[in-house]
Amino acid sequence: MKGSSVPRFVDRVVIHTRAGSGGNGCASVHREKFKPLGGPDGGNGGRGGSIVFVVDPQVHTLLDFHFRPHLTAASGKHGMGNNRDGAAGADLEVKVPEGTVVLDENGRLLADLVGAGTRFEAAAGGRGGLGNAALASRVRKAPGFALLGEKGQSRDLTLELKTVADVGLVGFPSAGKSSLVSAISAAKPKIADYPFTTLVPNLGVVSAGEHAFTVADVPGLIPGASRGRGLGLDFLRHIERCAVLVHVVDCATAEPGRDPISDIDALETELACYTPTLQGDAALGDLAARPRAVVLNKIDVPEARELAEFVRDDIAQRGWPVFCVSTATRENLQPLIFGLSQMISDYNAARPVAVPRRPVIRPIPVDDSGFTVEPDGHGGFVVSGARPERWIDQTNFDNDEAVGYLADRLARLGVEEELLRLGARSGCAVTIGEMTFDWEPQTPAGEPVAMSGRGTDPRLDSNKRVGAAERKAARSRRREHGDG
């Protein structure tokens, strides 16, 4: 029985994140001997755990997400009496390789994670609900309700790994890119004499005197790669960060219609069809404007050496440095190494100095102060907005006082006024979030509460405590009865 093949290198995954929900607040009254009417003492719910990506230099692939695409953080604990707050849910820290790019469902760039220890909050945990002690105020002395915890953020994200390298090697299959990486660095990629030997990017560290740089070898391109031929353009994401692009050309190929000039032109056409994901500060500029160099490979073959010398000047007229090398005999590898090192230095020196950024990157904040009210086409209305929808999630609809508190909040926000302006009548259906209810202006919160105002207790306003004179008279009556 053959087992299914397991990929060793994964550079693009879709994951599903769900942060922890906040704990519910507690509605309780302080109970202690000789302390009647102790007042509310319900604690707040704990914050839900967030999902945080952390760059780890020891991680080099997104393979773990291929097997475990669902990430869930712990929820917060509920509040308790005696002013005890619930424990916060633990954050789920997930290790990702350097160069990971986070995209939302619409393909919008959320974060470009570069640098060991860089953190990104992928999904925020829900806030804990307030207990009745926190809801107490001058006019609401004894709330008989608490708020529910908010739901944690849940969303689907796409993770793409874009290799962090200084030099990117591009070329046709079997042009000798992997052999070049192996010859100038300590990397040991798979090398064989057939097309598409390289199926995953290979990285190598190259020493150039006192300096060092990294080289990325991506799978070979062929004409039509932008239309999906061969391995397509998927692996070109790994050269988006490269400061220098190097065309590796096979001068010893015997394929009809192939020559160094046409190979370079075909590759440039495919590169022009590629649309980078990184934009703005995260990008190094358009690939078309990136510095180029050309490596004419396999000059250990006599015919290849003649061809390389013949086309060298024509290629140099484009303003690109040209290196004629042989990875088999290691001829001219040192000039190539130091030439690439100088190109990297010149390119980095010409770039503007990057402004240091905070190590923690967060999604774009959303203004939750507004709302909209629209007719639903069936005689009802739909209220949309982050704040009213969050209030709905916080409300325990089994508690009349909590429902009344929700009505007060919506009225203060202006929802009731807007409904009246649009012609809403008592009893019409109003939908907020996932809840649909019959709307009543200033909905009462229960008969006992309505008599003395929401969140108050008539017992607190009365004064039925026995005074000293009354206690003295009572003792006198007891003594008289005892003597009789």
Curated annotation (Swiss-Prot):
<dbReference type="InterPro" id="IPR036346">
    <property type="entry name" value="GTP-bd_prot_GTP1/OBG_C_sf"/>
</dbReference>
<keyword id="KW-0378">Hydrolase</keyword>
<dbReference type="Pfam" id="PF01018">
    <property type="entry name" value="GTP1_OBG"/>
</dbReference>
<dbReference type="Pfam" id="PF09269">
    <property type="entry name" value="DUF1967"/>
</dbReference>
<feature type="binding site">
    <location>
        <position position="178"/>
    </location>
    <ligand>
        <name>Mg(2+)</name>
    </ligand>
</feature>
<feature type="binding site">
    <location>
        <begin position="297"/>
        <end position="300"/>
    </location>
    <ligand>
        <name>GTP</name>
    </ligand>
</feature>
<dbReference type="Pfam" id="PF01926">
    <property type="entry name" value="MMR_HSR1"/>
</dbReference>
<feature type="domain" description="OCT">
    <location>
        <begin position="363"/>
        <end position="441"/>
    </location>
</feature>
<keyword id="KW-0460">Magnesium</keyword>
<feature type="binding site">
    <location>
        <position position="198"/>
    </location>
    <ligand>
        <name>Mg(2+)</name>
    </ligand>
</feature>
<dbReference type="InterPro" id="IPR045086">
    <property type="entry name" value="OBG_GTPase"/>
</dbReference>
<comment type="similarity">
    <text>Belongs to the TRAFAC class OBG-HflX-like GTPase superfamily. OBG GTPase family.</text>
</comment>
<feature type="binding site">
    <location>
        <begin position="196"/>
        <end position="200"/>
    </location>
    <ligand>
        <name>GTP</name>
    </ligand>
</feature>
<feature type="domain" description="Obg">
    <location>
        <begin position="7"/>
        <end position="164"/>
    </location>
</feature>
<comment type="function">
    <text>An essential GTPase which binds GTP, GDP and possibly (p)ppGpp with moderate affinity, with high nucleotide exchange rates and a fairly low GTP hydrolysis rate. Plays a role in control of the cell cycle, stress response, ribosome biogenesis and in those bacteria that undergo differentiation, in morphogenesis control.</text>
</comment>
<dbReference type="InterPro" id="IPR006073">
    <property type="entry name" value="GTP-bd"/>
</dbReference>
<feature type="binding site">
    <location>
        <begin position="217"/>
        <end position="220"/>
    </location>
    <ligand>
        <name>GTP</name>
    </ligand>
</feature>
<dbReference type="GO" id="GO:0005525">
    <property type="term" value="F:GTP binding"/>
</dbReference>
<keyword id="KW-0479">Metal-binding</keyword>
<dbReference type="InterPro" id="IPR015349">
    <property type="entry name" value="OCT_dom"/>
</dbReference>
<feature type="compositionally biased region" description="Basic residues">
    <location>
        <begin position="474"/>
        <end position="484"/>
    </location>
</feature>
<dbReference type="InterPro" id="IPR006074">
    <property type="entry name" value="GTP1-OBG_CS"/>
</dbReference>
<dbReference type="InterPro" id="IPR014100">
    <property type="entry name" value="GTP-bd_Obg/CgtA"/>
</dbReference>
<keyword id="KW-0963">Cytoplasm</keyword>
<dbReference type="GO" id="GO:0042254">
    <property type="term" value="P:ribosome biogenesis"/>
</dbReference>
<keyword id="KW-0547">Nucleotide-binding</keyword>
<feature type="domain" description="OBG-type G">
    <location>
        <begin position="165"/>
        <end position="345"/>
    </location>
</feature>
<comment type="subunit">
    <text>Monomer.</text>
</comment>
<feature type="compositionally biased region" description="Basic and acidic residues">
    <location>
        <begin position="456"/>
        <end position="473"/>
    </location>
</feature>
<dbReference type="GO" id="GO:0003924">
    <property type="term" value="F:GTPase activity"/>
</dbReference>
<feature type="region of interest" description="Disordered">
    <location>
        <begin position="21"/>
        <end position="43"/>
    </location>
</feature>
<dbReference type="InterPro" id="IPR027417">
    <property type="entry name" value="P-loop_NTPase"/>
</dbReference>
<dbReference type="GO" id="GO:0000287">
    <property type="term" value="F:magnesium ion binding"/>
</dbReference>
<feature type="binding site">
    <location>
        <begin position="326"/>
        <end position="328"/>
    </location>
    <ligand>
        <name>GTP</name>
    </ligand>
</feature>
<dbReference type="InterPro" id="IPR036726">
    <property type="entry name" value="GTP1_OBG_dom_sf"/>
</dbReference>
<feature type="region of interest" description="Disordered">
    <location>
        <begin position="439"/>
        <end position="484"/>
    </location>
</feature>
<keyword id="KW-0342">GTP-binding</keyword>
<feature type="binding site">
    <location>
        <begin position="171"/>
        <end position="178"/>
    </location>
    <ligand>
        <name>GTP</name>
    </ligand>
</feature>
<dbReference type="GO" id="GO:0005737">
    <property type="term" value="C:cytoplasm"/>
</dbReference>
<dbReference type="InterPro" id="IPR031167">
    <property type="entry name" value="G_OBG"/>
</dbReference>
<dbReference type="InterPro" id="IPR006169">
    <property type="entry name" value="GTP1_OBG_dom"/>
</dbReference>
<protein>
    <recommendedName>
        <fullName>GTPase Obg</fullName>
        <ecNumber>3.6.5.-</ecNumber>
    </recommendedName>
</protein>
